[in-house]
C-alpha cells in the first residue's frame, strides 16, 4: 500500500475526528434531525451514515471536526451531487450548524496549506516544549 502524502492525510477524517463529530452530532444526520426534505430520503439511505466535508477534499478541505458533520447517505448524496437544486441551501444550513458549534469558525481555517501546517507545527512544538520545561 502506498504511503499517503501529508496533504492527503490532512484531508481525511482520522478516527479521533470521526468520533468527535459523531458525538457532537448525536450519532444522527444533521439534516434528518431537522427533517430537511425527508420526502427524498429512504429508510435505507438513513441507515448508512458517513462524515460530510463542508469544504470538499477536492478543494483542500481538511479532515477536522470544524469541517465535517454526520450525514445519511441520502442527504450526503443530495449535498454532493446537487441534483435536486438544494446544494446552496444545504451548504448554508451546514455552515450555520458549524458556526453554532464553533464560535471562532472560519472557512479560511478549513483548507490545507503547506505553510499553515508548518506554522501550526512550529507553534505547537514550541508550546509543548515550553510547557514541559515549566
Sequence positions of predicted segments:
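Active-site hotspot residues in diverse enzymes, especially metal/ion-binding acidic/histidine motifs
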Residues: 80
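Histidine-centered nuclease catalytic patch
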Residues: 31-70, 85-90
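Zinc-coordinating Cys/His ligand positions in small cysteine/histidine-rich zinc-finger domains
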Residues: 71-75
Amino acid at each position: 500500500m502506498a504511503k499517503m502524502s501529508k496533504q492527503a492525510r490532512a484531508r481525511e477524517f482520522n478516527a479521533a475526528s470521526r468520533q468527535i463529530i459523531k458525538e457532537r452530532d448525536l450519532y444522527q444526520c444533521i439534516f434528518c434531525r431537522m427533517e430537511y426534505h425527508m420526502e427524498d430520503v429512504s429508510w435505507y439511505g438513513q441507515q448508512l451514515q458517513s462524515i460530510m466535508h463542508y469544504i470538499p477534499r477536492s478543494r483542500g478541505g481538511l479532515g477536522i471536526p470544524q469541517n465535517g458533520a454526520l450525514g445519511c447517505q441520502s442527504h450526503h448524496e443530495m449535498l454532493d451531487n446537487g441534483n435536486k437544486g438544494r446544494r446552496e441551501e444545504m451548504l448554508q444550513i451546514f455552515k450555520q450548524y458549524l458556526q453554532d458549534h464553533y464560535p471562532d469558525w472560519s472557512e479560511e481555517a478549513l483548507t490545507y496549506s503547506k505553510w499553515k501546517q508548518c506554522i501550526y507545527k512550529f507553534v505547537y512544538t514550541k508550546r509543548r516544549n515550553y510547557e514541559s520545561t515549566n
